[in-house]
Amino acid sequence: MTSDFVILELLVKLNFALGWCVMSDLSIPHIKFSDGGSTIHFSHANGYPPLCYKALLSPFEVDHTVIASVHRPLWDHSGEPDSLRSWEQLGDDVQGLLPEMVNPVISIGHSMGSAAVLMAAVKKPDYFHKIILIEPVLVPRFATLILQALPSLARRAWPLARQTINRVDSWIDRDAVFGHFRPKQVFRRISDEVLWDYVNSGTVIDELGNYKLAYSKEWELQCYLKVYNCWELFKSLKVPSLIVRGAESNTLSRKAWTRLKKISPQSECIEIPNSGHLVPFEQPEILASKILDWIDS
């Protein structure tokens, strides 16, 4: 890790602890990882702040300016979680950030972050040179309709919603955070080093001196409840695109993957072995290499 990155990480941790985000000279909250070369923009997933992705993004810093969106759940004065009415707001935020950069950019998104990139790319294709969508969230239309019509029922009956709101989110120190997450099945393919990135970058110290998740579970739940139906967007996508699936994903199902390749034949679609929905953390070096090869092709 470079000394500049160490300084950046310390500043970002301080900013998150104080309720701020890194702004520099751009108006939409973001983090600037590096400065030099063409711009790569990154859009993070629900529940995973940008600095958790250090292992994935580090290879891009060598020859590129790397800037990551900071989505609304991490903003200062972002309002209550119910102020997020749709993921379309996240797409609008990406769309609002990019004109202040040197365009067009290469944009990478993971999960919810890929939906934000996709929405912005469909609305403003001139802002983008290429896009990479990692494990885009694709749900059946009926599911989004149910979530919109019956949010209270979804909170009570949807296993993911119950799991999110009931999870432990406060610990006495970061060793306790690591010890809590290390045995989790969802993190089984993630190395200790990358898991520590999540622990160090995904927690802040509260007013009682405890370590808590920087990305609150109330905001995380709201993002799940406001999932957007992205299927139709792929039919309108004109920007060159690479779509990535973790070969063992339980989020982007095999059935959805097959359908996606049919409705978006203009996109290049690849799978990363020995990985699932968290492929940016499970296989960061392989994924970064695949993306760089595609960018240069």
Tell where the protein language model's regions lie, with residue ranges.
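Conserved serine/cysteine hydrolase catalytic core
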Residues: 202-259
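Catalytic histidine-centered segment of alpha/beta-hydrolase-like enzymes
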Residues: 275-284
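Active-site loop/oxyanion-hole signature of alpha/beta-hydrolase fold enzymes
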Residues: 71-108, 147-149, 289
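Conserved HGGG/HGGXW glycine-rich cap/lid loop of the alpha/beta-hydrolase fold
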Residues: 32-79
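The conserved beta1-alpha1 loop
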Residues: 41-45, 110, 245
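Conserved alpha/beta-hydrolase catalytic His-Asp/Glu region
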Residues: 165-224
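Flexible "cap/lid" loop of the alpha/beta hydrolase fold
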Residues: 131-170
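Conserved hydrolase catalytic core segment
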Residues: 104-145
